[in-house]
């Protein structure tokens, strides 16, 4: 089909040969990202601004995923931050930062790793900025969360799960995650 000097050199559009024009390459990427839920509390204002004690920061995070359809998954990065002293809480921030990811033609293991390791890694800097802006808007120094190694945590969790399954083969099966 290629003519001399033609940019298109080989277009095999024969459906029997698999050239039906459909994109069968493995792909994963973000469609959009957004704040799904956010709560910001400043429970002891205005007195909190007179406190001299340095606060202790309690940071909790979790990753969730919900299938929207066969090719789209919503990934949620849940971050809870509480700054407190012996006098009480300075602020409490609860954030669910989410993204819609499209996944096509990936194996289950690759798709799982993208959803629970790579997608949170990509979402985190944006969620970190939301937290920093919220603490600044509360009247405190912006809280800059340290980077999180989501890929390392993912691999660690897989190793833990494999070890738990190996222990379960020799005796009673351990209870599943609640």
Swiss-Prot record:
Role played: One of the proteins required for the normal export of preproteins out of the cell cytoplasm. It is a molecular chaperone that binds to a subset of precursor proteins, maintaining them in a translocation-competent state. It also specifically binds to its receptor SecA.
Entry GO MF terms: unfolded protein binding
Annotated spans, Disordered: 1-25
Subunit comment: Homotetramer, a dimer of dimers. One homotetramer interacts with 1 SecA dimer.
Protein name, entry field: Protein-export protein SecB
Pfam families referenced in this protein's UniProt entry, alphabetically: SecB
GO process terms (BP): protein folding; protein tetramerization; protein transport
PANTHER family given in the database record: PROTEIN-EXPORT PROTEIN SECB, PTHR36918
Domain of life according to the entry: Bacteria
Naturally occurring in which organism (per UniProt): Erythrobacter litoralis (strain HTCC2594)
Similarity-based family: Belongs to the SecB family.
NCBIfam families: PRK05751.1-3, secB
